[in-house]
């Protein structure tokens, strides 16, 4: 392992002891102070962010994710306050029982330990990760991408200065250099890092999963579908589809494929009409193309190719698939889903129940936009990522997902026969 990285991780591991001694009320006060400092230094944050943005083309899909403006920084500070106000997730009694032999057994929540998060062009993640890890008693190792290095470095400075004002060991948070070559040593840090969470492209997630010797929770990649059923309400559908696709195209809960029942193809032009106002390019299968031809801007309408399905666009692009029934819709989703977020628009309760029961995803929706798959929208304050796996955590990962548990047994001298 790289010697410098190993030393940083050892220092971080040692800092878990100091972090565990901080009282819950103190953590809350520190997080509220951090939120105030974010607001106080908005102009400085934007200045550092502009340095990063100047090195990226505005047409790059990552540009929007990298951008921090006043509105987003204020929202970020508000998210920190929400995390601060959440109940303490540690020391929660999950189970308690008295055994016939007199033993008292409790199962209580504890921190995971040292959490490493590898992420790319979203500097807001730096603050989200720290606030959640700090509140849940975990040391955090931050491995941001080079495209956000100036912004991440300044945000880390704000965090460390806030901690210093309370005489807190600043080793509880660490920002590793942005070089990709350092990812492998981090993934090999058995005994020093308790969990790694990759947030970013599918290539990054695949690399981490395939090369890690430490535990990993997969997050991020979202190939998102919305199925407009035979019984779907047209007005609801128009609003939901537009919101899921165009609210923020660069996020993992954005709509990628619209699936439509063949009996409702006549309504397709109206369903997607507002998308043309945002210059959304549609990749339509044969049936959908025939309906949209002359009913959607010619320059924005393309014939779908096989690779357009099962693709996370992260852009103003949408694939459309026509199906004869709900079973075919579910089959298509199960073939191409990344198990992130899937939605149905329907008025038929039996269709809704079938979809919600049979579709395998971290979040399944009926008559609502997939844009809601978010820690803040789920009342978690913020999220460290959206898990697309089933072990330990699934969906938006808030404070509870950053804890484990231990068994506490009290006796009066009992021995086992």
Curated annotation (Swiss-Prot):
GO terms for molecular function: glutamate-5-semialdehyde dehydrogenase activity; NADP binding. Catalyzes the NADPH-dependent reduction of L-glutamate 5-phosphate into L-glutamate 5-semialdehyde and phosphate. The product spontaneously undergoes cyclization to form 1-pyrroline-5-carboxylate. Pathway: Amino-acid biosynthesis; L-proline biosynthesis; L-glutamate 5-semialdehyde from L-glutamate: step 2/2. Keywords: Amino-acid biosynthesis, Cytoplasm, NADP, Oxidoreductase, Proline biosynthesis. NCBIfam families: PRK00197.1, proA. CDD domains: ALDH_F18-19_ProA-GPR. This is Gamma-glutamyl phosphate reductase. PANTHER family: DELTA-1-PYRROLINE-5-CARBOXYLATE SYNTHASE, GLUTAMATE SEMIALDEHYDE DEHYDROGENASE.
């Amino acid at each position: 392992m790289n010697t410098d990285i190993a030393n940083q991780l050892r220092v971080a591991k040692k800092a878990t002891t100091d972090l565990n001694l901080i009282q819950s009320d103190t953590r809350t006060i520190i997080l509220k102070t951090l939120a105030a400092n974010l607001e106080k230094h908005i102009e400085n944050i934007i200045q550092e962010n502009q340095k990063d943005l100047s090195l990226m083309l505005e047409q790059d899909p990552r540009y929007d994710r990298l951008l921090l403006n006043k509105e987003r920084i204020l929202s970020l500070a508000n998210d920190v306050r929400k995390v601060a106000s959440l109940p303490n997730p540690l020391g929660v009694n999950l189970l308690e029982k008295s055994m016939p032999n007199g033993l008292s057994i409790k199962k209580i929540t504890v921190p995971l330990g040292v959490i490493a998060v590898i992420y790319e062009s979203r500097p807001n993640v730096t603050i989200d990760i720290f606030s959640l890890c700090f509140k849940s008693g975990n040391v955090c190792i931050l491995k941001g991408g080079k495209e956000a290095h100036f912004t991440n470095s300044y945000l880390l400075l704000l965090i460390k200065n806030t901690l210093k004002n309370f005489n807190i060991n600043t080793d509880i948070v660490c920002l590793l250099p942005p070089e990709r070559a350092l990812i492998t040593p981090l993934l090999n840090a058995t005994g020093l890092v308790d969990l790694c969470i990759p947030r970013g492209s599918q290539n990054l997630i695949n690399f981490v999963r395939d090369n890690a010797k430490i535990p990993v929770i997969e997050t991020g990649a979202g190939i998102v579908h919305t199925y407009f059923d035979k019984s779907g309400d047209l007005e609801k559908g128009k609003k939901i589809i537009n919101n899921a696709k165009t609210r923020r195209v660069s996020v993992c809960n954005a709509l990628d494929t619209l699936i439509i029942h063949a009996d409702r193809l006549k309504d397709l032009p109206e369903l997607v009409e507002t998308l043309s106002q945002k210059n959304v390019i549609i990749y339509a299968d044969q049936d959908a193309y025939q309906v949209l031809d002359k009913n959607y801007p010619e320059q924005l309408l393309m014939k779908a190719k096989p690779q357009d399905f099962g693709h996370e666009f992260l852009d103003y692009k949408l694939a459309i698939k026509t199906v004869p029934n709900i079973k075919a819709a579910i089959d298509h989703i199960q073939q191409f889903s990344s198990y992130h977020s899937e939605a149905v628009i329907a008025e038929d309760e039996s269709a809704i129940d079938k979809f919600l029961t049979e579709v395998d995803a971290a979040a399944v929706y009926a008559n609502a936009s997939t844009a809601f798959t978010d820690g803040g929208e789920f009342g978690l304050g913020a999220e460290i990522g959206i898990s697309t796996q089933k072990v330990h955590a699934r969906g938006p990962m808030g404070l509870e997902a950053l804890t484990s548990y231990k068994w506490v047994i009290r006796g009066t001298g009992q021995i086992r026969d």
